[in-house]
Structures are given as structure tokens and as C-alpha cells.
Curated annotation (Swiss-Prot):
Gene3D superfamilies: 3.30.230.10, 3.30.70.240, Elongation Factor G (Translational Gtpase), domain 3, P-loop containing nucleotide triphosphate hydrolases, Translation factors. GO terms for biological process: ribosome disassembly. It is found in: Cytoplasm. SMART domains: EFG_C, EFG_IV. This is Elongation factor G 3. GO terms for cellular component: cytoplasm. GTP binds at residues 17-24, 90-94, 144-147. GO terms for molecular function: GTP binding; GTPase activity; translation elongation factor activity. Its main location: cytoplasm. Residues 8-293 form the tr-type G domain. It comes from the Bacteria. Keywords: Cytoplasm, Elongation factor, GTP-binding, Nucleotide-binding, Protein biosynthesis.
């Protein structure tokens, strides 16, 4: 069966922003204007389509990315008059749920970055922008909340350039702001669009008001200058001084070219809540963001080889898909979200999972609308879908044709910063607790579940207090487990203080087959954030190449277990210098043990340095509370990096140890009568000051 929509009419997009910038509200309006829903729900009422988890409705925030599909026929531009399929992922804005943004951006072709017009670029909007940079995702920007007090379009655009290093290009200019926001000027066509009422209706084709004509013409000249850098036709007309000959089609072609090359970012404006500017944004999604066929062929490598291969977008190519999200459903079991890069999948298609070596048979295929399902017979290259029947698949796994295997780039791993202990209230609930945590950890790669080696307690590690609070709440609501929960603690790390050379000989002669392994390692600290840097510097084949991965595996296992109090060891450089084998007793298992014990012995000799997570904090506060905010940050061992005025408030940037930040946001609201706000994200792991190491080491053992 052929696809219903041609691939060039697909748009796979995400909506991303800082918390409270209006992502979910914008998504609701997109669904409304595309006819996907017939009435809009509001975030503050807990009635939105895309925030379907009970925790999302209760808290008024997005926790998990939600997928849906809509169709839009642009009024104008290159896609005018032709229905386009838009697959939308609405992503969280809270830093604790940044893994949802990470995995969404990994599989999307384009994104809409939403900014609060009164704030411009905020901390988490900067974080998600960097994530989009990592995956080379083309973007357009939507300056939202133009009807809000303090809205400033020019400031917001300037902040995109100053803080994100991007080249924002305004394709619209607002007429008024705050309560006076009444319309906008389409700079591409040089005509005004006046909003008419609260239902999203507008009057197009109006003359540009004389009061703003000079400013608007200056902005259009900037637009033309930016487009001249992207398109030869625009450049020729611009250089010749024939500005009146530059058509809307010329500018749209240049804007699309620049957006796809990520050399510029088209910027639009509006008010999602008031339904203003949303239809023009939908036109821009079609006209400026790429189809799957516009993107480079996805690349991977052949399992077990260094050979790079590509998979062009083609329905007739070998099936290739990436599992980017898992979800449990009581009615149907495990649901695996897939981005199909090539080929066609049907119920019964057999796929290889190179990560496990297992073959998986596709059960049913579905398109999702939040938590609702639409079953389909087949899916094609470019589709974002969900599948049942895939038993052994994890987030980040590739599923491919067994005859033409390939492994695609997986997802980035995020280091947790907070942990807490949980335990079942009764022995009868222990199995339910373990099963529930196993399912939640399978869904959420940023959630780590471990066991305290001394107390035997189950430890949850995550991205923040709210993250773990939601996990515990989901244990109760989805798995029926009322767990006892300890106080949140810092997720400490250790690293090595100095470099040492370590020999280790592992010999076992009794109790079954013999084991023999001898290794000589050079072990020392690696640059911060490097993880394990392992190199094989042996000469003359003293250790066969097939045994070297076992040594690395043993070293990695010892680092994960840590050398004191179960605290993981990070950022270690290991050079394998020499070794020895026995013709019969030298097995991969023996060398894994030798690598593990050699690393532990080296760490005890080198000494360990305790590391703590240090957060990048931004506080927005009225001027009258600035002194109190700064004093409190200093008392928490914070280092103020800078301050800037944002209208009537001050923005304070600081780096503060996570150990000093438990309960900070709640306390800040109390001290400022609810008028100050704070956000934070992990900056880096840094050494604990010598004066605090003894007390923090005791806390790590507690």
C-alpha cells in the first residue's frame, strides 16, 4: 500500500522552550486550527490534550513528550494550497525532564523554539537550543505572549543572537505590545495583518500603518540583507539596488535555504493563548522547516565493523528505525515509539536489534495522539509511529533489516544530580516496587535504579527533586506502590587525584577451570566529563586483541561500583601497557576480573577526590529583593557570574553547589513574597572544597 502523503509534504517538528513560555498552549492552538481538536483546553485548568499524565494535569507542566499528527494547508508561500502532514512532539520545559527533549530532538527534522516576549532567552531555552545544535536541527522561533505586560519583541530577538549565537531574522514585526498588541506586519509581503476578536480571526492585506512605516522598512531591509547571504538571486538584486524587484518568493526561498542550512532562524510573533499569529506560524512550519527528504541520509555503522553506511529516505530501502521512547500501557503492554528512517514496516515485519542480537517481530503499528492510538496497516520512511510486540527493545536501540544491519547514533547519557532511598512498606509489596521501578527506568533513561551496598536500600538517582518526586508519585498512581521515601541527597562522584602504574595478577587454580590473567595499567585522572578513556598500548601481542575488551569492561564495572561507599568513580584515563596470558586458563572472564581489581588497587594508591554537582542558577527578582537574593546565594557557596536588567526586574546568574540548593526555590518564593523565580541546570561536577570533604564524605556514607 502506498503512502497517503508524499514525503516532501511531511514535517516532523518539536515545540521546545523554557518552562511557562507557552509550548503546550501553542500546541493546543496548532491542534485547534488544524482541526485535530474542536475545542481548546487550558494548561491552568489541567484540560489540555497533550498533557495527559495525572501529574501533568495536577502540576500544570509537561513531564513527558507527547506525539500527535495534524494536517495543514498553507494560505501562502511555497506550500500554499497543498495539505501537509505535521507530526508534532510537545516537549517539557523543566530542566528535570530534559531527557524528553533530548530524545525528541534526536528524531526530529525541525523545531519551533518558543520564547516569552517579556523574558527573551531563558536558562532552559538556552539548554534545549544547545541540544538542538547537537543534532543539527533546523529551527524557527516564535516570540509568544506579545499580549503580556513587558513584552518586548526587539529585546527577545536580540537575546537570541546574544545568548544563543544564532542569527535571528524577523519575518514579522508586531504592531503594539501588551494590551495594545493588535496585529503584525508581514515583512516578506510588506502588508499588515490585523487581529479581529479572540477566536483567531484576522484581516490580511492591510496597508502598513504610517506611524510605524519607517521602522518596518528598516526591518525589511535587514531581512533582505540576511536573505542576500543565502540566495544568489536576492544578492544580485540587492547589489544592483533593485530592492523593488525582490519578490516574496525570492525571500521565502532564501529563508528556507538559510533555515535548512542553520545559518539563520526566521522569527515570528504572536499570542498562543489569544490565538493570535498561530495560523501564520503553521504556514512558516511548512514553508521554512524541512521535510524528511530535505535532510541528509541518516548514517550509522555496520555492527562489529568500523564501516560507515547511510540509509537514504526511501520506502523501498531496507527497513531502519530508531526506538526513541518507551511507554507502558495497562491495556496493551509496552509501546515503543519509532522514527522510521528508511523502508516500510508492517505488522509481522521481522527486524534485528543489533544491541541485543535478537530478532523482533512487529505486532501492531499505530499513530499516537497523546495517549490515544490510531492503528495502521503500515508505516513508511519519515513516519513517527508506535509499535507493539517489541519485547527486548530499549531507548536508543536501532531496529533494522537482518540482511543489512546498521547501528544508528543513540541518545546522549545524562548524569543524575540527586538521589533518594525508597523501600516497600511491606515485604509483600517488594516485588511490586521492583517491577514498577524497572518499568519506569525502562521508559526514562535519565532515571537510575541501584542498591546501596551497605544498607541494601533501593536508590533512585535523577535530574532533580521534582523528577524523583514525580517518579515516586507514578509508582503510586500507575503501579499501586506506596513507597517509603528518604530525604533527597546529592549524587556524589569520585575521581582520582594522581597517576599511578598498577600491576595485577589474577590466578585461580581450584574450584573448577583455572583462571589466569596478568595486566599492567597506567591509571590517572582524565579531563572533567571525559568518562573512561581506555587505550591499548601493548606491544608485541602480549595480550591478544580479543581479550582487551574484557579488561575495559572490568575497569568500567569497577568505576561504576566505586571504591568507597558505592560512590561511582568518573573521569579516569587507563592505558593498558603490558600483560601476560596462559595458554589454557586466560579467558575473557579472567581478564575482566583482573581489570576490575587492578583499577580498585590503583584507585586506593592514587587517592580519590570527591566531586559535587554544581548547578547553573538564574534568578529573576524585583530590584527591592536583589540584596537578599545575592546574600542568600553567597551563603549557599554560590558564585555570582553576572547581573543584567530585564525591564523592571534583575536577572542574576550564578553557579551554586547542588548540596546547597535543596528547597531553594520554595524558600526564594517565601522570601520575596512569590515575586522572584529561579531555574537551574547542571553545570559540571567540581571538586569539593577541602574544608568540607570530611562532612560530605560522611553524608555520602549516610
Amino acid at each position: 500500500m502506498s503512502r497517503h502523503t508524499r514525503i516532501e509534504r511531511y514535517r516532523n517538528i518539536g515545540i521546545m522552550a523554557h518552562i511557562d513560555a507557552g509550548k503546550t498552549t501553542l500546541t493546543e492552538r496548532v491542534l485547534f486550527f488544524t482541526g485535530r481538536i474542536h475545542s481548546v483546553g487550558e494548561v491552568h485548568d489541567g484540560a489540555t490534550e497533550m498533557d495527559w499524565l495525572p501529574q501533568e494535569k495536577q502540576r500544570g507542566i509537561t513531564i513527558t513528550s507527547a506525539a500527535t499528527t495534524a494536517f495543514w494547508q498553507p494560505r501562502q508561500g511555497m506550500g500554499a494550497g497543498v495539505p501537509h502532514r505535521i507530526n508534532v512532539l510537545d516537549t517539557p520545559g523543566h530542566v528535570d525532564f530534559t531527557i524528553e527533549v533530548e530524545r525528541s530532538l534526536r528524531v526530529l527534522d525541525g523545531a519551533v523554539a518558543v520564547f516569552d516576549a517579556s523574558q527573551g532567552v531563558e536558562p532552559q531555552s538556552e539548554a534545549v537550543w544547545r541540544q538542538a545544535d547537537r543534532y543539527n536541527v533546523p529551527r524557527i522561533a516564535f516570540i509568544n505572549k506579545m499580549d503580556k505586560v513587558g513584552a518586548d519583541f526587539a529585546m527577545s530577538v536580540a537575546s537570541i543572537q546574544a545568548r544563543l549565537g544564532a542569527r535571528p531574522v524577523a519575518v514579522q514585526w508586531p504592531l503594539g505590545a501588551g494590551s495594545e498588541f493588535r496585529g503584525l506586519v508581514d515583512l516578506v509581503r510588506m502588508r499588515a495583518v490585523m487581529f479581529d476578536g479572540e477566536d483567531g480571526s484576522f484581516v490580511d492585506g492591510q496597508a502598513v500603518p504610517e506611524a510605524v512605516r519607517a521602522e518596518v522598512e528598516a526591518q525589511r531591509l535587514r531581512l533582505i540583507e540576511a536573505c542576500a547571504d543565502e540566495d544568489a538571486t536576492v544578492l544580485e538584486k540587492f547589489v544592483d539596488g533593485r530592492l523593488e524587484d525582490i519578490t516574496a518568493e525570492d525571500l521565502e526561498r532564501a529563508l528556507r535555504s538559510g533555515a535548512l542550512a542553520r545559518t539563520l532562524v526566521p522569527v515570528l510573533c504572536g499570542s498562543a493563548f489569544k490565538k493570535k499569529g498561530v495560523q501564520m506560524l503553521l504556514d512558516a512550519i511548512v514553508n521554512y522547516l524541512p521535510a524528511p527528504s530535505d535532510m541528509p541520509a541518516v548514517e550509522g555503522f555496520v555492527p562489529g565493523k568500523e564501516e560507515r553506511v547511510s540509509r537514504p529516505v526511501s520506502d523501498s530501502g531496507p527497513p531502519c528505525a530508531l526506538a526513541f521512547k518507551l511507554m507502558s500501557d495497562k491495556a496493551v503492554g509496552g509501546i515503543v515509539f519509532l522514527r522510521v528512517y528508511s523502508g516500510t514496516l508492517r505488522a509481522g515485519t521481522v527486524l534485528l536489534n543489533p544491541a541485543t542480537g535478537r530478532r523482533e517481530r512487529v505486532g501492531r503499528l499505530m499513530f499516537m495522539h497523546a495517549n490515544r492510538r490510531e492503528e495502521v496497516a503500515e508505516v513508511h520512511a519519515g513516519d513517527i509511529c508506535a509499535a507493539l510486540g517489541l519485547k527486548g527493545v530499549r531507548t536508543g536501540d536501532t531496529l533494522c533489516d537482518p540482511a543489512e544491519p546498521v547501528v544508528l547514533e543513540s541518545l546522549g547519557v545524562m548524569e543524575p544530580v540527586v538521589q533518594l532511598a525508597v523501600e516497600a512498606r511491606s515485604p509483600a509489596e517488594l516485588t511490586k516496587l521492583e517491577d514498577g521501578l524497572h518499568r519506569l527506568a525502562a521508559e526514562d533513561p535519565s532515571l537510575r535504579v541501584g542498591v546501596d551496598p551497605e544498607s541494601g536500600q533501593v536508590l533512585l538517582s535523577g535530574m532533580g527533586e521534582l523528577h524523583l518526586e514525580v517518579v515516586v508519585d507514578r509508582l503510586r498512581t500507575e503501579h499501586g506502590v506506596e513507597a517509603r521515601v528518604g530525604q533527597p541527597k546529592v549524587a556524589w562522584r569520585d575521581t582520582l587525584r594522581r597517576q599511578v602504574r598498577q600491576e595485577y595478577r589474577h590466578v585461580r587454580q581450584s574450584g573448577g577451570p583455572g583462571q589466569y590473567a596478568y595486566v599492567v595499567l597506567d591509571v590517572g585522572p582524565a579531563p572533567r566529563g571525559a568518562g573512561l578513556v581506555f587505550t591499548d598500548d601493548t606491544r608485541g601481542g602480549t595480550i591478544p586483541k580479543e581479550l582487551v575488551p574484557a579488561i575495559e569492561k572490568g575497569v568500567a564495572g569497577a568505576m561504576a561500583r566505586g571504591v568507597r561507599d558505592g560512590v561511582p568513580l568518573v573521569d579516569v584515563e587507563v592505558r593498558l601497557l603490558d600483560g601476560d596470558t596462559h595458554v589454557r586458563d586466560s579467558t575473557p572472564q579472567a581478564f575482566a576480573v583482573a581489570g576490575s581489581l587492578a583499577l580498585q588497587a590503583a584507585a586506593h594508591r592514587a587517592g580519590v577526590q570527591q566531586l559535587e554537582p554544581v548547578m547553573e542558577v538564574e534568578v529573576t527578582t524585583p530590584e527591592e529583593y536583589l540584596g537578599e537574593v545575592l546574600g542568600d546565594l553567597a551563603a549557599r557557596r554560590g558564585r555570582v557570574l553576572g547581573m543584567e536588567a530585564r525591564g523592571v526586574v534583575r536577572l542574576v546568574s550564578a553557579r551554586v553547589p547542588m548540596a546547597s540548593l535543596f528547597g531553594y526555590v520554595t524558600g526564594l518564593r517565601g522570601r520575596t513574597q512569590g515575586r522572584a523565580q529561579a531555574s537551574m541546570r547542571l553545570g559540571a561536577y567540581e571538586p569539593v572544597p577541602e574544608a568540607l570533604q570530611a562532612s560530605y564524605a560522611a553524608e555520602a556514607r549516610a
